[in-house]
């Protein structure tokens, strides 16, 4: 697991009181930031895997088989975790799902 910074005094006040709902892009970003601050949290996801609506296997997903990102991967990727070079500039939903899975696995989320 990557090293985390010591929690700031304000963050320490929140220890044990954070419920993180969803493991889509926003939930993963929030989880990573809490992790970097050293703030423990409990995550909740309705589906069995990460990716949120980008996970076509999620029964609640509204993504369709031919869906692609409409913005470049370079403006969408997490700053500290670039998308693989072989991923197209406008990734498919399957590439996005894999990216979110790899991000979660890499940071132990």
Where do the model's predicted regions map?
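Glycine-rich active-site loop/strand segments that organize a redox cofactor
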Residues: 48, 53-99
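Generic structural signal for beta-strand residues in well-ordered domains
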Residues: 11-13, 34, 47, 68
